[in-house]
From Swiss-Prot:
Listed GO biological process terms: L-histidine biosynthetic process
GO molecular function, one term: zinc ion binding
InterPro entries: PRA-CH (IPR026660), PRib_AMP_CycHydrolase_dom (IPR002496), PRib_AMP_CycHydrolase_sf (IPR038019)
Name of the molecule in the record: Phosphoribosyl-AMP cyclohydrolase
Residues the record lists as binding Zn(2+): 86, 102, 109
Keyword Iron annotated: no
Species annotation: Methanococcus maripaludis (strain C6 / ATCC BAA-1332)
PANTHER family: HISTIDINE BIOSYNTHESIS BIFUNCTIONAL PROTEIN, HISTIDINE BIOSYNTHESIS BIFUNCTIONAL PROTEIN HIS7
Pfam family, one: PRA-CH
Co-factor note (free text): Binds 1 Mg(2+) ion per subunit. Binds 1 zinc ion per subunit.
Subunit and partners: Homodimer.
Amino acid sequence: MDLDVKEIIKNMNLKFRNIEGKKLLLAISTDKYGNVLMTAFMSEESLKKSIETGFMHYYSTSRDKLWRKGEESGNIQKIINVFRDCDGDALLFTVEQTGWACHEGYMSCFHNKIDLNTGKSTVVGNKLD
């Protein structure tokens, strides 16, 4: 018999941290090759929605609300796997990315390479159409 989502989350042994007055944890999404696509925060509610639907939901601290990845752009993330870090305050998701992950039009949000000698950044990768 399958457990309900609240029981699943309880069994994950997570430690939601107080971030900007909300109980959140860090969520990292990668593609099937391990390339980092993005990081965002998750609330217990967004984690619950992610488990229930099989698609990534996050918590936006700037908009103070839950959001489904791709709800406006169509660039959704279907969950393949999830891993918990050793402290229980971060989750690593392997996802099937439709379109690009970054709201700036890049596959990854990590497209600004920093030169540690100057602090200046260079864009790596191409914008996707």
